[in-house]
Design a protein with these regions (language model features):
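Active-site neighborhoods and metal-handling regions in enzymes and metal-associated proteins
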Residues: 1-254
């Protein structure tokens, strides 16, 4: 998804706490959805639960209507990388279900994603999920004042490729604040020491998307759903994180 513009907006401590509140809501709703994922459940059921949580918490869905996207959730299963539509397809034992979700609360956005195993999954699928999660942690750890954007990128890439998997290059992380997508872009591949220098007050959504096979993706006829071109599994984790003088502050972690 395109960025709002090329301006880097540094956030005050008060603004970061407002972003924290929005991201806590995202994290709590994702936890609720994770708890109900099991064989036989559908993406549309998750969407209905999500709609109820949004109404109860008096927040706005960040994705629904954004550049025409028709749902509150992105639900991507197995070979789907990102932006999958919630559907009537039932989840089966061994599936990987990635949920990407965001809200708008008091003028600030929250955004996070998680990949959830359905029942017992294969050892290869489990290793993909674990590696993707670990790559996110590595990227977050690089979010320190004075480092550069591609220090984050390189940390993610080295974790992923060291495990024999591929980082998706067609989609990137991004700044977040009063807009869902702000500058800078944060690729999941790059060279240490390159890119914009990280400053206190930057808030970034770091989101490795990792394929078991090659890095290439294609878009389905719905115009949104991205899938691996080779049909292999994909996993996706995301946190919104603030750069502070004390290190990274993960806003979407509870």
């Amino acid at each position: 998804m395109p960025l709002a513009d090329n301006t880097i907006v540094l956030k005050s401590k008060d603004e970061i706490e407002k972003l924290r509140r929005a991201n806590i809501v995202v994290a709590e709703i994702l936890a609720r959805l994770t708890d109900v994922i099991e064989p036989g459940v559908t993406g549309l059921e998750l969407e209905r639960i999500c709609e109820g949580e949004i109404k109860k918490r008096k927040v706005e869905a960040a994705f629904k209507g954004y550049r025409g996207y028709p749902y509150c959730l992105c639900v991507s299963v197995n070979e789907m990388v990102v932006h999958g539509f919630p559907s009537k397809r039932t989840f089966r034992e061994g599936d990987l279900v990635s949920i990407d979700f965001g809200v708008l609360l008091d003028g600030f956005y929250g955004d996070s994603a998680v990949t959830v195993p359905v029942g017992k999954i294969s050892s290869d699928a489990a290793r993909l999920v674990d590696t993707t999660r670990a790559s996110l942690d590595r990227g977050i750890d690089a979010m320190r004042v004075g480092n550069r954007v591609q220090d984050i990128s390189s940390a993610v890439q080295s974790e992923v490729e060291g495990a024999g998997f591929s980082v998706v290059r067609a989609f990137v992380g991004h700044g977040i604040g009063r807009n869902l997508h702000e500058s800078p872009q944060v690729p999941n591949f790059g060279k240490p020491g390159k890119g914009m220098r990280l400053k206190e007050g930057m808030v970034l959504a770091i989101e490795p998307m990792v394929n078991a096979g090659g890095c290439d993706v294609k878009i389905l006829d719905d115009g949104w759903t991205a899938v691996t071109t080779d049909g292999t599994l994909s996993a996706h984790f995301e946190h919104s994180v603030a750069v502070t003088r004390d290190g990274p502050y993960v806003l979407s972690r509870i």
